[in-house]
């Protein structure tokens, strides 16, 4: 909906709250905001005014070229360090909620494996460590930082999932093969937080795992806080 040159493109509850947070903010040129997980393409950008400003998280190369030709300024929220830090923390909290909802055990009784130790994986490991949850990390990154939170740091290959009640993936690559999946406990909880799953989800479910992918998790678990993080970014970069 439009307000004072602002269009917040509605795609989830987070964007509803963002519109409310920006209700009294005026913009001197047409300004459009898309959810960070929406990949903006040429067909979407074609409807936006020349000279407009667009806040987004992803766009195609063709859309980027079209924006340049029409003097449309793109602001990529996913390149902002502060926003990424907040978004990772909110994602970690959402992952904890999923763990509690899906596990038949108390999380204090669970052995957890986190795949990946980038910004999101580190945020999850830090939160689980604070709760004194038994945790291992698999990563291709430097091992030393992960050892601050994990009992063991493992290579990102030849997985043996048998010790783990919960597996959380943050790597947007198919790093787990079907043979590795057969080591997973029946009834294990697999939470994929990446844009693309690391495993064959259908096969994992066939083997008895509670497996699913949860993109844009903060928009579902804490939509107001996710919107507030976006609002703070917009207020900072668009004066």
Language model regions located:
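Short, polar loop motifs at secondary-structure junctions
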Residues: 12-15, 37-40, 58-64, 138-144, ...
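NAD(P)-binding Rossmann-fold cofactor-contacting core
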Residues: 27-28, 131-149
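Active-site rim beta-loop-alpha module in soluble metabolic enzymes
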Residues: 127, 139-143, 170-175
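Rossmann-like adenosine-cofactor binding region
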Residues: 37-51, 147-220
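Residues at the starts of beta-strands that form the adenosine-phosphate
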Residues: 4-5, 28-30, 111, 134-136, ...
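Glycine/serine-rich phosphate-binding loop and adjoining beta1-alpha1 elements at the start
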Residues: 34-35, 39-108, 233
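Rossmann-fold NAD(P)-binding glycine/threonine-rich loop
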Residues: 58-75, 193-238
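Glycine-rich adenosine-cofactor-binding loop
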Residues: 4-22, 108-129
């Amino acid at each position: 909906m439009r307000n004072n040159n602002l269009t917040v493109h509605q795609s989830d509850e987070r964007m509803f709250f963002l519109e409310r947070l920006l209700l009294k903010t005026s913009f001197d040129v047409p300004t459009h905001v898309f959810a960070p997980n929406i990949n903006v393409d040429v067909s979407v950008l074609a409807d936006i005014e020349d000279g407009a400003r667009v806040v987004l998280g992803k766009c195609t190369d063709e859309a980027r070229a079209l924006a340049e030709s029409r003097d449309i300024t793109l602001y990529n929220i996913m390149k902002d360090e502060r926003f990424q830090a907040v978004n990772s923390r909110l994602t970690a909290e959402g992952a904890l909620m999923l763990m509690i909802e899906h596990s038949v055990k108390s999380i204090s009784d669970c052995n957890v494996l986190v795949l990946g130790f980038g910004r999101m994986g580190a945020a999850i490991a830090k939160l689980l460590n604070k709760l004194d949850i038994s945790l291992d990390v698999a990563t291709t990154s430097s091992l030393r930082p992960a050892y601050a939170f994990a009992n063991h740091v493992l290579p990102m290959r030849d997985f043996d999932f048998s010790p783990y009640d919960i597996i959380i993936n943050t790597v947007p690559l198919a790093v787990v093969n079907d043979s590795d999946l057969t080591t997973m406990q029946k009834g294990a909880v697999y939470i994929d937080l990446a844009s693309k799953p690391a495993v064959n989800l259908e096969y994992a479910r066939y083997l008895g795992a509670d497996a699913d992918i949860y993109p844009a998790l903060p928009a579902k678990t804490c939509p107001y806080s996710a919107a507030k993080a976006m609002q703070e970014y917009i207020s900072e970069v668009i004066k």
